[in-house]
Amino acid sequence: MSLKYSSTTADYLIWSDAMNLIRKLAKDENYKISLLIALGCFTGLRISDILSLRWKQILDADEFTVIEKKTGKVRTIRLNPQLQQHIKECYEHINPIGINAPILISQKGTIFTVQRINIILKEVKKKYKLKIKNFSCHSLRKTFGRQVYNMNSDNAELALVKLMELFNHSSVAITKRYLGLRQEEILQTYDCLSF
């Protein structure tokens, strides 16, 4: 986590790069991290909420409910068929101790920490030569947000309102800043000038 008002912030992955990464990790038999990235990109959950998930919540489920650790709010998440299939494949390869087990357990038998996940993601960035400056747990949530926004560009304001509610932001302006849209809009101002 960065200090408030500091310039370091997580970046998002281009959606196609994120999907390719999920597939490559699974192909390389790194099912836990493949699952982590898939859940982050497809649900927009914070890492603290992903780490608290148990197999019984997500395996063979169309949707599941979480109580967000940061806000205490109840949130229902729908899982699309492709993600459901990926969850099932990861479950079969990970072979956890049971359906009640947390989905992301380290080799030591403990739930991964946020700090450890961030270290792993930096290693993944290097190994797979990802074109992203600051890759961290939060990048997954931002990747989700950017994809939702991009897929609804014909009705961008509605997409931003939906994302504002999903992210529990107090305003659309905060959501725009969170997704890096405000900075992009400012930089595009320079592009409209001609010589």
Residue ranges and their predicted role:
Residues M1-M19, G72-P81, N100:
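DNA breakage-rejoining catalytic core of tyrosine-based enzymes
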Residues Q82-I132:
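Active-site/catalytic core of tyrosine-dependent DNA strand-transfer enzymes
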Residues E68-G72, F167-C192:
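Catalytic-site neighborhood detector that most strongly recognizes the C-terminal catalytic loop/helix
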Residues I132-M151:
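Short basic/aromatic active-site micro-motif
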Residues S2, L13-T43, D154-N155:
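Basic, Lys/Arg- and aromatic-enriched nucleic-acid-binding interface segment
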Residues S52-L83:
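Conserved tyrosine-mediated DNA breakage-rejoining catalytic core shared by Y-recombinases
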